[in-house]
């Protein structure tokens, strides 16, 4: 049972008693409603408030209306949409799964929730910060940045406010500005890829997004389980990534367009690295090893190409390369590699 492992306690270590809370972004029991009571008991013992978001796998497979399919979830965790405040930030939880039974569903926010959210928005002071947590993402970046129609209406209702969507569902990690004043944080899985694989299928380490508010300022950073908070990048030597055999390749999994990723060769600044889209080399090697062992690979285990990779081609005489990534908040992360070594 996942929450009886150290994972939840590692996430929450240092948070208890420090004005913190956890938001679980859905698919809490993965089509196993008999686990709701046990999961709720584990949440209750964690020492911080835990706010639930309903996912498509939290619906009752034996029901054929959305209302009936969410009854078991609501019995254990309460309403599927609600709001709460922390600090100066207003948090709204929504259900953006319209369930039709037998695992068939639409990713939309129903009219009742949209009206409720719009009425909530009207009561907020101008320029408020609002975080909307829901399961499916508002925008699908891999489908030409297609935005959910009901999310467009939601953004219109919160125009004039600082709006953040916090979402899950995709098993990917990304931070995108959808429109002026609106950012979506689509968070990777804390369990790797569906508990089967040690990292997510886009190459993001298993972990969680940590949002902070301090003195009214709002920031975020990704925390990889079992790693120092300072570990935010992964660098490969030339020859380790087949698509870029002569290049140093860096992965920056919490990247957004406000980051800078630069490189140094033997201490000399060489400028910005080139962003590219790749299947993650580590994840691909993991899947290849499973195939070699005769394991059948499901479609949700296939590597997912992602655009948070960066390349630079060092000179033939270079002895060392350092990659430095700086996030939008000015935090600096670096990794050095000695050329000629592949360990």
Question: Which residues are covered by each model-predicted region?
Answer:
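Single conserved hydrophobic/aromatic residue that forms the stacking wall/gate
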Residues: 1-21
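Short acidic, glycine-rich surface-loop motifs adjacent to enzyme active sites
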Residues: 25, 121-142
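Active-site glycine-centered loops adjacent to acidic/histidine catalytic or metal-binding residues
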Residues: 26-27, 55-56, 135, 168-169
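Extended active-site neighborhood of metal-dependent phosphoesterases/phosphodiesterases
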Residues: 33-126, 145-166, 172-214, 218-221
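Binuclear metal-dependent phosphoesterase catalytic core
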Residues: 182-266, 304-336
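Short, surface-exposed loop motifs enriched in S/T, G, D/E and P with embedded aromatic residues
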Residues: 268-281, 300
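Aromatic sugar-binding surface patches on proteins
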Residues: 280-311
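Short beta-strand edge segments in extracellular beta-sheet folds
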Residues: 338-343
